[in-house]
Amino acid sequence: VNMVDRVEVMRGGGSALFGSSAIAGTVNIITKEPATNSASLSHSTTSIGGTSALDNITMLNASLVTDDHKMGIAVFGQNRQRDGYDANGDGYTELPTINSQNIGTRMFLKTGTYSRITGEYHHLQEYRRGGDSLSIPPHEANIAEEVTHSINTGSVKFDYFAPNEKHRLSIFGSIQHIDRESYYGAGKNPNAYGGTTDLTWVAGAQYNYKFDKCIFMPAEFIAGVEFN
């Protein structure tokens, strides 16, 4: 969340303007855009339930912007190591162990006074393990839930604004690849392993025009096309 600027929630059929499949609503996570030259590094350690189980989180943020503000880049990274937590001492975790790394970047380039290109890339690598006997393979434990995710996401967008601010054209594309390996089983079942690989891409364009007066009131016309 250290790169999140705001979260926009839109309910109802009007959300289809943001995507052809968004018929019930959308949740848009808007990431921060680089505005100044800055860098920060932080680390926190939390004891879970006052025990020796620790949650360690290290975060890095940095941004660089040219003097004329025509180009900028922001990068972030997070490393999290959380121990499994057994609240009642029965040998089974209530909170799984977590080992995750998250990195990403957002950059922009102003190609003209009224146009710009924005690009983003995010990578998430996460391992979770819950149950008992966390130090041995999951199929040797009595109960085990183990999931490993590797997610890569990238997007690029071109925006053009007319000098009179009435016309706007956006051309966009994004792609995401997910690799997931899991184990959900009990009784030392060796056949409870699973795996999933998925590739998703979206590309499209959107045109907006603002009417100062349409019949008797201001209005906005929106048209677009999307492929996935």
Name each model-derived stretch.
Residues 1, 9, 21-44, 56-61:
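N-terminal periplasmic accessory domains that precede
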Residues 45-49, 66-68, 79-83, 123-127, ...:
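Transmembrane beta-strands of outer-membrane beta-barrel pores
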Residues 25, 39, 56-60, 71, ...:
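Hydrophobic, lipid-facing positions within transmembrane beta-strands of outer-membrane proteins
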Residues 82-102, 108-110, 114-169, 176-198:
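Flexible loop and strand-edge segments within Gram-negative outer membrane beta-barrel domains
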Residues 10, 30, 61-65, 76, ...:
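Transmembrane beta-barrel domains of outer membrane proteins
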Residues 39-43, 73-77, 105-107, 119-121, ...:
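Membrane-embedded beta-strand positions of outer-membrane beta-barrel proteins
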Residues 34-38, 66-71, 113-116, 161-168, ...:
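Short loop/turn motifs that connect adjacent beta-strands in outer-membrane beta-barrel proteins
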